[in-house]
């Protein structure tokens, strides 16, 4: 084992590296960068499942999927390197009232990769890809639940915060299990083993129940913060879109889980013969209510953006994922309700998300090359 002086030398080397300009990206990297995965992944999912397809669209989705996988492993490598070189930064991140909230972006970004495996790889590669996605999903679900349970408790016990300094980023660790539950519905729908599918959707309903009501509590507190202290600072104004995330993804998750329940419950004689139909109908009903609730939060966000200028930062990725998951709920309602209205609206939202992804991705690459995002 290294001696005390050996540890000192390691720390000294890490400190010297931190001061070098070419290490600044690793030194100042934080979990919020995984929002790039969230935005890229949801864009690939939307294009793959667009109600109105055209030749070549599938290949664009495949390219984005591959890009997302590359970015994810790049960011994971940078994160591991950062905390190996500067172990104290991990504790500092957990103690930071803002950066700790961004931990939720890691499993949510990973969930988009799992969904793309189901949508893109399973139809080509078959059952083994479905089982592979299922295994990855269990990892994602465990990490999501751990973050959802741990970070809010840190907020209660360790972080110094006030109503005035609150932002919608408080939702991020709580939304992670909502995304995992929705992803579980997608994975379960691809499983050929009905027992595995049943276990998966029951776990998903439990995760949904753990996270969505808590997200609603946060929304109440956030509305009170806005009513009393007015809009958040301009640097964080893009976070105004975050509330539509749990509402859109929560609604999509219930509908997707209902689809699987309708198919699997009768086969396994689970509960009553009509249990699957009840879960399916109730899921669609609650999803419609959540979607409607999301509309007013979307209006609040859009109205907030008109109140003044705001400048680019990594938080701009909130332009993509929250609206993206709201769009998945929209297109799913078009599918389940056989509604051209929701198909057209979902297509419009998908185009908006794709355009925002192009803009934000280009700015992110440029600002990363100039290292402005790391200072």
From Swiss-Prot:
Could you tell me the superkingdom of the organism this chain comes from? Eukaryota
**UniProt keyword terms in alphabetical order:** Cell membrane, Glycoprotein, Membrane, Transmembrane, Transmembrane helix, Transport
Q: Where is this protein found?
A: Cell membrane
Residue ranges annotated as Extracellular topological domain: 47-59, 123-135, 189-200, 256-277, 331-343
Recall the GO molecular function terms of this protein's record.
sulfite transmembrane transporter activity
Glycosylated residues in this chain: 193
Inducing factors: Expression is strongly increased during growth on protein rich medium containing keratin or cystine-arginine.
Transmembrane parts of this sequence: 26-46, 60-80, 102-122, 136-156, 168-188, 201-221, 235-255, 278-298, 310-330, 344-364
Keyword Disulfide bond on entry: no
Topology in membrane: Multi-pass membrane protein
GO cellular component term of the entry, any: plasma membrane
Which ranges of this chain reside in the Cytoplasmic compartment per its record?
1-25, 81-101, 157-167, 222-234, 299-309, 365-375
Q: What is its main location?
A: membrane
Function description: Sulphite efflux pump required for the secretion of sulphite as a reducing agent. In the presence of sulphite, cystine in keratin is directly cleaved to cysteine and S-sulphocysteine, and thereby, reduced proteins become accessible to hydrolysis by a variety of secreted endo- and exoproteases. Excretion of sulphite mediated by an efflux pump also represents a detoxification pathway for dermatophytes during infection of the epidermal stratum corneum, hair and nails, which are rich in cysteine.
What the record says about family reads:
Belongs to the tellurite-resistance/dicarboxylate transporter (TDT) family.
Identification of the protein by name? Sulfite efflux pump SSU1
């Amino acid at each position: 084992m290294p001696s005390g002086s050996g540890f000192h030398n390691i720390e000294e080397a890490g400190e010297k590296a931190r001061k070098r300009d070419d290490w600044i990206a690793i030194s100042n990297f934080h979990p919020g960068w995984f929002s790039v995965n969230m935005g890229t992944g949801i864009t690939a999912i939307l294009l793959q499942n667009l109600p109105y397809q055209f030749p070549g669209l599938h290949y664009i989705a495949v390219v984005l999927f591959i890009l997302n996988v590359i970015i994810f492993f790049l960011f994971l490598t940078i994160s591991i390197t950062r905390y190996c070189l500067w172990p104290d930064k991990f504790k500092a991140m957990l103690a930071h009232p803002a950066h700790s909230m961004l931990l939720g972006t890691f499993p949510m970004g990973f969930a988009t990769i799992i969904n793309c495996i189901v949508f893109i790889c399973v139809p080509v590669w078959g059952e083994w890809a479905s089982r592979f996605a299922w295994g990855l999903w269990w990892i994602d679900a465990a990490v999501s639940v751990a973050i959802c349970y741990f970070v809010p408790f840190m907020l209660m016990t360790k972080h110094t915060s006030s109503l005035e300094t609150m932002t919608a980023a408080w939702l991020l660790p709580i939304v992670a299990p909502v995304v995992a539950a929705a992803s579980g519905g997608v994975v379960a729908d691809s499983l050929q083993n009905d027992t595995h599918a049943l276990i998966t959707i029951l776990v998903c309903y439990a995760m949904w129940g753990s996270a969505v009501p808590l997200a609603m509590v946060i929304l109440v507190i956030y509305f009170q913060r806005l009513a009393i202290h007015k809009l958040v600072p301009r640097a964080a104004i893009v976070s105004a879109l975050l509330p539509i995330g749990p509402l859109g993804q929560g609604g999509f998750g219930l509908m997707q889980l209902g689809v699987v329940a309708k198919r699997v419950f009768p086969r396994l004689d689970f509960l009553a013969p009509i249990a699957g139909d009840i879960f399916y109908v109730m899921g669609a009903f609650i999803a419609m209510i959540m979607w409607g609730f999301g509309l007013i939060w979307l209006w609040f966000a859009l109205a907030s953006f008109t109140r003044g200028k705001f400048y680019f930062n990594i938080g701009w990725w909130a332009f993509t994922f929250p609206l993206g998951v709201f769009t998945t709920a929209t297109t799913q309602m078009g599918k389940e309700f056989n509604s051209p209205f929701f198909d057209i609206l979902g297509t419009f939202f998908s185009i908006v998300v794709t355009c925002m992804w192009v803009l934000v991705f280009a700015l992110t690459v440029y600002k990363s090359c100039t290292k402005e995002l790391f200072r």
